[in-house]
């Protein structure tokens, strides 16, 4: 059986962007740093990444659609943090951001990863932004690098 999978080596011929939600920036800024670090650890130059800032996680799919439609980007790492509060707002934002990113990815046939934290507390967000539970921004970028290479293998 032939196994087809991506690897964790940056394809320097591909243009990559990060879309980051500014809401909860004390968390999302750490996710961006993790993503940049992962890109560097796997052979890329973080200075070659474009950072697209949006107000919140709900706006990520719109920016992703515009970025991929432009033809400028081969892949996008989407980052943000939605923290549960006392109202159902969390449920609406997290669900629509998730569905939106998935739909846009399928629409353009280009890889995007979903590094948007959906957590119950600030403590959980902090843990996932570089303390106890690693950095989910770094994980999202590593996944994106692997997907870029997998897509390349599947297109041949």
UniProtKB/Swiss-Prot annotation:
Pathway: Cofactor biosynthesis; riboflavin biosynthesis; riboflavin from 2-hydroxy-3-oxobutyl phosphate and 5-amino-6-(D-ribitylamino)uracil: step 1/2. 5-amino-6-(D-ribitylamino)uracil binds at residues 23, 57-59, 81-83, 114. The keyword Transferase applies. The keyword Transferase applies. One of its GO terms (cellular component) is riboflavin synthase complex. The active site is at residue 89. Its EC number is 2.5.1.78. It is an enzyme of class 2 (transferase). Belongs to the DMRL synthase family. Catalyzes the formation of 6,7-dimethyl-8-ribityllumazine by condensation of 5-amino-6-(D-ribitylamino)uracil with 3,4-dihydroxy-2-butanone 4-phosphate. This is the penultimate step in the biosynthesis of riboflavin. This is 6,7-dimethyl-8-ribityllumazine synthase. It comes from Sulfurovum sp. (strain NBC37-1).
């Amino acid at each position: 059986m032939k196994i087809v999978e991506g690897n964790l080596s940056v394809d320097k011929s591909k243009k990559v962007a990060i879309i980051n939600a500014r809401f909860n920036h004390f968390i999302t800024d750490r996710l961006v740093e993790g993503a940049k670090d992962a890109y560097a650890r796997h052979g890329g130059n973080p200075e070659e990444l474009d950072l697209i800032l949006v107000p919140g996680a709900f706006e990520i799919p719109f920016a992703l659609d515009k970025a991929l439609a432009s033809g400028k980007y081969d892949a996008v790492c989407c980052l943000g943090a939605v923290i549960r509060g006392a109202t159902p707002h969390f449920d609406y934002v997290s669900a629509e951001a998730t569905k939106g990113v998935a739909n846009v990815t399928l629409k353009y046939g280009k890889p995007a990863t979903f590094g948007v934290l959906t957590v119950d507390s600030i403590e959980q967000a902090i843990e996932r932004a570089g303390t106890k539970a690693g950095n989910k921004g770094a994980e999202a970028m590593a996944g994106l690098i692997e997907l870029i290479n997998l897509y390349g293998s599947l297109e041949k």
